[in-house]
Regions:
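Glycine/Thr-rich phosphate-binding loops that ligate phosphate moieties of nucleotide
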Residues: 1-135
Length: 135
């Protein structure tokens, strides 16, 4: 955290942590893209993606990408079920099993263009301050 003052409030600290997490995600996506790994879509599963619309919207705004969130309380178990049904021959592919068994997506978060320029200024400052060291 930078700029911390005695008057800094808990919501301001929470926002700073959420923003730093979103910036780190963007840094990872940028690094992958620069090295030839194209990420076609972002999908939120469990935890924060289901509990915090605020964080998910911030992530969409920072990355400039739409994020789909699935509505599944036991995503890991459902993933096992999907693969097991394909291996057992119930479905011909993972995609077919997903279409049949999963509720996808429950919500979508679309980037808000009006927020992007300000967030990109803050992202550049984050990188300049040494966010997500690259080694």
């Amino acid at each position: 955290l930078t700029g911390l003052r005695l008057s800094t409030t808990a919501p301001e600290i929470y926002y700073a942590l959420a923003e730093a997490t979103a910036f780190a995600t963007k840094a990872i996506l940028d690094h992958l893209a620069a090295n030839g790994v194209a990420i076609e879509r972002l999908t939120g599963i469990g935890g924060i993606s289901q509990k915090s619309p605020f964080v998910m919207q911030l992530l969409a705004d920072v990355t400039g990408r739409e994020i789909s969130v699935i509505d599944c309380k036991q995503a890991c178990a459902m993933g096992s079920v999907v693969y097991a049904t394909v291996i057992a021959g119930c479905y011909g592919s993972v995609e077919e099993a997903q279409r049949a068994l999963c509720n996808f997506p429950a919500r979508r978060y679309t980037p808000r263009d009006e927020r992007h320029p300000l967030l990109m200024q803050r992202y550049e400052r984050y990188k300049a301050q040494g966010g997500l060291p690259q080694r």
